[in-house]
Regions:
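AAA+ P-loop NTPase nucleotide-binding core of proteostasis motors
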Residues: 2-45, 50-109, 114-135, 139-382
Length: 382
């Protein structure tokens, strides 16, 4: 950290022992044990992505233990930056939350990449993600440097100066262009970086400096249209006149990008990304669309169980017949919205019952039944 300048307040400096104790308190689990914890916490499906992410979490813990418990510098080339690609509702950010907020319990920030802007323009400077990491780490820069930054909607940073078109949205929206990508390029490779402790709202504090050798950066995005772009390259399609527009392929929203397609840096470049930025991610993990069986498990083990607990507190037993579960899963598959579509279908129905019966402590215990009648879900209390 640079010396304090006149008129600027220095950052607080917590003791090294605080960080050491926090790191020592994290339970050391093998990648297989981490994967098992994911199941215990309700994560379903995505076996390949789970394996990759469990190893990512294990390596993250190993790095911070090496630094703070063994007193050894990070091994060269061990920094992990990971790119999660897959359709909406496939469990990308949920996996990050469970791994790093729940299992490892290290400082974790989920940032919306569409809010980033190039320095000097309206919007969040890229380095403000470090400000947020500093905040969730109780304003302890050393503890923050043990954390994880997850940038969601990363695919929306694709510049419009390409032939990329977001399938399903029919737009070539350019949120921030190459400027933000260049800023991220530096952040993902720099050994350390300055950050505004107050998010840049005032100039009373000197900039903080955070060591980044142990910070794991994860980018998440649907990358709708990337598969069609990669397949076009495989067919030898060219740029310019005579090329079939990408949108004409009518690619489904929920698609699975193969490992071979992930290796095509040219596909990312045509999509609208600087090849060097994609190269900063040493692991690209593809998430598959969730199938009916997995959605059924998520519906039963996560969505319905949460609703059952809520309604039970209000004196209502929630009962959902199998036909309703199949209907809800089928609608989520049709919408291609993955696990998000499950709650979207149930929420309006259950909100009506909640409006009528929540907060009325004088009512006797009752049962709320969801049934399927003529293709429509009905909710009745009796």
């Amino acid at each position: 950290m640079s010396p304090t300048r006149p008129g600027l307040e220095p950052l607080p400096r917590p003791g090294d022992d605080d960080v050491r104790a926090r790191v020592a308190a994290i339970e050391v689990l093998s990648p297989r044990e981490i994967d098992g914890r994911l199941t215990d916490l309700g994560y379903r499906g995505q076996p390949e992505a789970r394996r990759a992410a469990s190893v990512l979490a294990y390596r993250h813990l190993r790095r911070i233990r090496r630094l703070h418990l063994e007193g050894l510098p990070p091994e060269p080339g061990t920094r992990e930056n990971c790119l999660f690609l897959g359709p909406t509702g496939s469990g990308k950010t949920f996996l990050v939350e469970l791994l790093f907020r729940e299992i490892l319990a290290v400082p974790t920030v989920l940032a919306d990449a569409t809010q980033f802007s190039e320095t000097g323009y309206v919007g969040d400077d890229v380095n403000t993600v470090l400000s947020r990491l500093y905040e969730v780490a109780d304003r302890d820069a050393e503890w923050a440097a043990c954390g994880v930054v997850c940038m969601d909607e990363f695919d929306k940073l694709a510049t419009s100066r390409s032939d990329s078109r977001f399938a399903g949205q029919q737009t070539t929206k350019d949120v921030s262009g190459f400027g933000v990508q260049r800023s991220l390029l530096h952040l993902l490779s720099a050994p350390s970086a300055d950050f505004p402790p107050d998010f840049g709202f005032t100039s009373r504090q000197q900039p903080g400096r955070m060591e980044l050798a142990c910070v794991t950066f994860i980018a998440c995005g649907a990358f709708s249209g990337l598969k069609a772009t990669a397949e076009g390259l495989e067919r030898g399609e060219h740029l310019g006149f005579g090329r079939e527009p990408l949108g004409s392929h009518k690619e489904r929203i929920a698609t699975h990008v193969t490992e071979e397609q992930l290796e095509q840096t040219t596909a990312f470049a045509r999509y609208g990304f600087i090849p060097e930025l994609i190269g900063r991610f040493n692991r690209l993990v593809s998430f598959a669309p969730l199938d009916a069986a997995t959605l059924g498990d998520i519906l039963q083990d996560n969505v319905l169980r949460a609703y059952e607990r809520e309604f039970e507190l209000e004196g209502l037993r929630l009962r959902v017949e199998p036909a309703v579960r199949e209907h809800v899963v089928a609608r989520a598959l049709k919408r291609e919205t993955g696990a998000r579509g499950l709650r979207a279908t149930l929420a309006p129905l259950l909100e009506k019952a909640a409006y009528e019966h929540f907060g009325r402590g004088d009512e006797a215990p009752a049962t709320l039944r969801l049934t399927l009648e003529d293709g429509h879900v009905q909710a009745r209390v009796g």
